[in-house]
Amino acid sequence: MRIAIGQVNELTEEFLTFAKQLGLDDVQMNLYNLPTDMKDTGRLEFMDLLRLKTRAEERGLRLIAIENVPIRFYDKIMLGKEGREHQLANMQESIRNLGRAGIPIFGYHFISTGVWRTGWETPIRGGAISNSFKTELAKHAPWFYDRDYNEEEMWANYDWYLERILPVAEEYNVRMALHPDDPPVPKLGGVPRLFRNFDNFKRAMERHPNRMHGLDFCHGCWSEMRGGAGVLEAAEYFGAQGRIFYVHMRDVKGGCDDFTECFINEGNSNIFNVMMKLRQVGFKGFIIDDHVPHLVNDSAYGHRGRAHATGYLTAIMDVVNQLQPDPTPSASKANDLKPAILAKTPRKKKPSNTPPVFKPPSKRALAALPKDPMVKGGGKLK
């Protein structure tokens, strides 16, 4: 378990220097700036991915994950519309190219209408600027697409996609990490939002148990779901199965019908207890900050806000490491599956439905954990 840096769409010299100054080794990119030709092809290209990975490595960093592609790359897949086969072929080739380039994780979502907020300049502590959401202001929004969609057809579309993309992901050693819907409400813009609660994530993992299928555990979204309740239970359930591939660590005040993103140390959850729980269940992936408040004189990327969040997470990590040392510290990066050999087509392997299993901590280590972790706040299950 380690802290990384991410939510960046370009590996500028300034960003790479910032990462090293924070003492981090791993980089995640989110919806990176696409070359003009890639915008037309609708897929991630091998040479572009290789250039990104090489640029990070030249500065002593690892490009560990690419998260998200433009919604237009797979909107027909999500909605079950004509043309989805063409988009599927492009997404399959994108996965192959990630594997060929040695980038082991692809973070994805199934949110055809995107992230919604009803307030983008919400003042929080000390006048910092954040964002917020109120269901009351969004529930009457018009259809985002051509009609109103129902939940079961969205599940059918999701199953169709996963059945066809996961065998490619397994062949090329690329793990697919599912992000929750944000906000996690039943429907917005006429389209159901499937990944809004524990039961639906459980359904997705059970229906597609391939070892390459897991979670981008966005703590902020899980905190939104029930006002902070249930976060530890979800981390324990999916973490013990080895289904949490990496973590977005942010927090909110409130629940899914009315919440405000806040500083990481003042939200619904006790972040220390969350990270301790992740260590307890054997999580060995990386944790990054996520959305951060915009501080005075901050940059567009939010360097000040991110330095605050990353420093906070690093300090907690240090304490967690002291209270429960990793019994196999050399394996901290071994959790990232070995990438396919560069530019060489790997052998086809029979798909496996067995998730990776992590050895639980010893009884002595468990006894050292805090009892009855406290979660602040509350909310109704949606």
PLM features per residue range, with description:
Residues 138-154, 180-190, 295-297:
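Active-site-proximal beta-alpha loop/turn segments in soluble metabolic enzymes
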Residues 2-4, 9-11, 16-20, 57, ...:
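Histidine-acidic metal/acid-base catalytic patches
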Residues 24-32, 66, 108, 134-135, ...:
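Non-cysteine beta-strand/loop elements that form the S-adenosyl-L-methionine
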Residues 30-159, 170-171, 221:
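Structural motif corresponding to the early beta-alpha repeats
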Residues 71, 111, 181, 218, ...:
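Short loop/turn motifs enriched for small/polar and acidic residues
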Residues 27, 35-36, 72-73, 114-115, ...:
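Short secondary-structure capping/turn micro-motifs that flank functional sites
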Residues 29-30, 70-73, 140-144, 179-183, ...:
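Generic detector of short, locally flexible boundary/turn motifs and exposed helical patches
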Residues 1-46, 53-54:
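N-terminal basic, low-complexity leaders that serve as flexible interaction/assembly modules and, when applicable
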